[in-house]
């Protein structure tokens, strides 16, 4: 047998081993109905394995144990092996979104099922298989290279699919307070589109939400001179707002966009001018525009139209995350090389999509990249992931560790 044949045989065997180990751990995690913010024991499974691999594991709890909703207690796991730099951290979440009516699922959402080449379960794509793949990759890397350079870390939360106020952001605050820095962060969100590794996210747009409240005076529709219609007062300003150009984007980001998601006004009666109007809108913004610039331009538009109006307006702002970008460099290159070596794919860099917990990590100075399985079924009924991708993803993650910690 030639050296080429030996290498191919070895690679095939390695992939099969990675796949079975990743599949087994994925199933163990997917069996837990960890609907946000409930971890339901997933992090205990990870902690036990990582401790055996030489990681120091620390559970971090934030929030109120007695509360529900956004103030509920959240369980987070910080695990680290090594004390030196660079620190490569895998960030992920064990919580999942609700299933909806389980009768609509082909297979029970918390009974992981292998069928037609897929692993079906809530959280299969978003993102328990990603957590499993990196865990297997870390275990195998540590076993093969116990004296590796730098450190490997895990930051796992159960508050990514919810309000995201007692999860990753609080862990990062704790790490920053004790001067514990992440050099490279690999977020295991499902980034791929058509094939494993075809897309990696090297940045995300910022998200700035707003609730506009316009207050007028209620009255009869037949006597408009005795009332002040907040809907009429806002129409011209909203028209200009939705047609405004905010920036032209850049090589990494599309132009900043605005979308109105909700408009509420009226009493339900057809003969009553309402007193108030509420409009909810959101900016997804690039690095070409700042939060303050968006606010200032928005207020300038409304000030222009409300200057002589009897109605008054107020805007409540909520920033969900600043835009971030990891330019092509060591982390991006390590990911590209790993994907190419395992799948043969030349990956594409992208900043599309919604927000992720990477928005809390990037401001610390860490290079952040998102790389995971295909995202075609995330948050949907019959969420699933290709079984063959599990072993390959674990291999990709292991190659990334080799690229960053062995040179």
Swiss-Prot record:
<dbReference type="GO" id="GO:0009089">
    <property type="term" value="P:lysine biosynthetic process via diaminopimelate"/>
</dbReference>
<keyword id="KW-0028">Amino-acid biosynthesis</keyword>
<feature type="binding site">
    <location>
        <position position="93"/>
    </location>
    <ligand>
        <name>Zn(2+) 1</name>
    </ligand>
</feature>
<feature type="binding site">
    <location>
        <position position="379"/>
    </location>
    <ligand>
        <name>Zn(2+) 2</name>
    </ligand>
</feature>
<dbReference type="GO" id="GO:0008270">
    <property type="term" value="F:zinc ion binding"/>
</dbReference>
<dbReference type="InterPro" id="IPR011650">
    <property type="entry name" value="Peptidase_M20_dimer"/>
</dbReference>
<dbReference type="InterPro" id="IPR050072">
    <property type="entry name" value="Peptidase_M20A"/>
</dbReference>
<feature type="binding site">
    <location>
        <position position="126"/>
    </location>
    <ligand>
        <name>Zn(2+) 1</name>
    </ligand>
</feature>
<comment type="function">
    <text>Catalyzes the hydrolysis of N-succinyl-L,L-diaminopimelic acid (SDAP), forming succinate and LL-2,6-diaminopimelate (DAP), an intermediate involved in the bacterial biosynthesis of lysine and meso-diaminopimelic acid, an essential component of bacterial cell walls.</text>
</comment>
<feature type="region of interest" description="Disordered">
    <location>
        <begin position="1"/>
        <end position="20"/>
    </location>
</feature>
<dbReference type="GO" id="GO:0006526">
    <property type="term" value="P:L-arginine biosynthetic process"/>
</dbReference>
<dbReference type="GO" id="GO:0008777">
    <property type="term" value="F:acetylornithine deacetylase activity"/>
</dbReference>
<dbReference type="InterPro" id="IPR005941">
    <property type="entry name" value="DapE_proteobac"/>
</dbReference>
<dbReference type="InterPro" id="IPR002933">
    <property type="entry name" value="Peptidase_M20"/>
</dbReference>
<feature type="active site" description="Proton acceptor">
    <location>
        <position position="160"/>
    </location>
</feature>
<protein>
    <recommendedName>
        <fullName>Succinyl-diaminopimelate desuccinylase</fullName>
        <ecNumber>3.5.1.18</ecNumber>
    </recommendedName>
</protein>
<feature type="binding site">
    <location>
        <position position="189"/>
    </location>
    <ligand>
        <name>Zn(2+) 1</name>
    </ligand>
</feature>
<dbReference type="Pfam" id="PF07687">
    <property type="entry name" value="M20_dimer"/>
</dbReference>
<keyword id="KW-0457">Lysine biosynthesis</keyword>
<keyword id="KW-0220">Diaminopimelate biosynthesis</keyword>
<dbReference type="GO" id="GO:0009014">
    <property type="term" value="F:succinyl-diaminopimelate desuccinylase activity"/>
</dbReference>
<feature type="active site">
    <location>
        <position position="95"/>
    </location>
</feature>
<keyword id="KW-0862">Zinc</keyword>
<feature type="binding site">
    <location>
        <position position="161"/>
    </location>
    <ligand>
        <name>Zn(2+) 2</name>
    </ligand>
</feature>
<dbReference type="GO" id="GO:0019877">
    <property type="term" value="P:diaminopimelate biosynthetic process"/>
</dbReference>
<dbReference type="InterPro" id="IPR036264">
    <property type="entry name" value="Bact_exopeptidase_dim_dom"/>
</dbReference>
<comment type="pathway">
    <text>Amino-acid biosynthesis; L-lysine biosynthesis via DAP pathway; LL-2,6-diaminopimelate from (S)-tetrahydrodipicolinate (succinylase route): step 3/3.</text>
</comment>
<dbReference type="Pfam" id="PF01546">
    <property type="entry name" value="Peptidase_M20"/>
</dbReference>
<feature type="compositionally biased region" description="Polar residues">
    <location>
        <begin position="1"/>
        <end position="10"/>
    </location>
</feature>
<keyword id="KW-0378">Hydrolase</keyword>
<dbReference type="GO" id="GO:0050897">
    <property type="term" value="F:cobalt ion binding"/>
</dbReference>
<comment type="similarity">
    <text>Belongs to the peptidase M20A family. DapE subfamily.</text>
</comment>
<keyword id="KW-0170">Cobalt</keyword>
<feature type="compositionally biased region" description="Low complexity">
    <location>
        <begin position="11"/>
        <end position="20"/>
    </location>
</feature>
<comment type="subunit">
    <text>Homodimer.</text>
</comment>
<feature type="binding site">
    <location>
        <position position="126"/>
    </location>
    <ligand>
        <name>Zn(2+) 2</name>
    </ligand>
</feature>
<keyword id="KW-0479">Metal-binding</keyword>
